Amino acid sequence: DPLVFFKXXFXXG
């Protein structure tokens, strides 16, 4: 899912 990557990677990263 693109949303998971965006939230996980952007928020978490």
From Swiss-Prot:
Keywords: Calcium, Chaperone, Endoplasmic reticulum, Lectin, Metal-binding, Zinc
Protein name from the UniProt record: Calreticulin
GO MF entries: carbohydrate binding; metal ion binding
Coiled coil regions in record: none
Family: Belongs to the calreticulin family.
Task of the protein: Molecular calcium-binding chaperone promoting folding, oligomeric assembly and quality control in the ER via the calreticulin/calnexin cycle. This lectin may interact transiently with almost all of the monoglucosylated glycoproteins that are synthesized in the ER.
GO CC annotation terms, alphabetical: endoplasmic reticulum lumen
Superkingdom to which the source organism belongs: Eukaryota
Subcellular locations according to the entry: Endoplasmic reticulum lumen
